[in-house]
Amino acid sequence: MTNIRRTERVLLGAVFAMEAGGSVIFALMGNLQDEFQFSDAGLGFIAAAGFMASFVMQILIAPYADRGHAKRLLIIGTTLAVVGNALFASGSSLIIFVLARLISGAASGLFLPPARALMASLDEEGVSERLGAMGGAALAGFVTGPVIGGFLVGPLGLRWPFVIFSIAALISLFIVSTQHLPTLPYSKDRQRLAFGLLKQRSVLVPILMLSSIALPVGMYDALWDRFLTDIGASDIVVGLSLAAYALPFVVLSRFGGRLADRRGKVKVSFISMLFVAPLTALYGWFTVPLIPILLGMIESCAQAAGAPAGQGLLAEGAPEGRASAAQGLAGACNQLLAAVVAILATWGYGQVSAPTLFTIAGACVLLMGSVAQVLARKLPQGRPA
């Protein structure tokens, strides 16, 4: 038990550091643009580079963790996190910043799937609880990175936040590389592309459920700032609203996972979706910023149960020797869906009213989640749910 707890703490700390170091750029992109005078399109190139690299790594490279290379991928991912932030700290051109973001995105894509698979494999009991804790640590890091970066850039200058997070990643690298980690169940079969796992219902169901509750995130990434500003929120209120949305998930995700382990992962993930869908539909109907913010906090509570439930279901449903591949596939699908939704939402916001747009999004959540629930009824008997 002691070794399990120690490994859990190492993985949680490393995930927090990885996500914090990867997200600090979001608070500093405007500063980089002002300092080095590149176009608005350059901001898009930097953001897109991270997404593309993470997506490719999760699909093509993360499955190698299932061949006995899980720790090696964690080490390589953490090393890339050091390099990515070091490049941001030393760079002075758009090309270097795009390369730095490409490396940082690859770091996350290499690290997270094997980390989730290892966390799930530590014990047959409490799978969703541990994955919930990891999700909470990841989101806490993602939110903390920009806050620390924004706080440090004034007194220390633009380069030092990246230097500090590069040092933090270096410390994480030392801890991960010296820690004894378990090995994932080994597969000697020839590995095919992870997309082939979608043919298996035990993988498709949790990915559909996870994608359904993750769908609104793509809208929030693209529209939350603009929507709240349009209904009268100040920049400070918008910033606080993001922290308010994240806080319930960070605090409750471990408990949500524990609930899923006890009450059933399919049941908890479906009930969570039934909360997320109407809450998503309601956002656009209010013109007082406080109400959407409060709805977001309620939705975050539902996400804190649904996400660990879906991830735990995926961990248990992945074929023997394909645990990391399945986790990478789920992460890649969520990223792809979020990108598509962000593009469509940005376009749709200028074409239809906010109530209509958010209602459509809520209906899509309900549709995807309902399809997953129907398919879940046909899962093989005896599979943990």
Whereabouts are the PLM-identified features?
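Juxtamembrane intracellular "pre-TM" segments in multi-pass secondary transporters
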Residues: M1-R5, H180-I207
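Residue-level signature of mid-helix packing/kink "hotspots" within the transmembrane helices
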Residues: F51-I59, F142-V143, A246-R254, A338-A339
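Conserved MFS/SLC helix-loop-helix module at the cytosolic interface between two early adjacent transmembrane helices
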Residues: V56-S92, A260-R263
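Structural signature of the two symmetry-related core transmembrane helices
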Residues: R72-A86, S166, K267-A281
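Cytoplasmic helix-loop-helix junction between adjacent transmembrane helices
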Residues: A100-A138
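A late C-terminal transmembrane helix in Major Facilitator Superfamily
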Residues: R322-G350
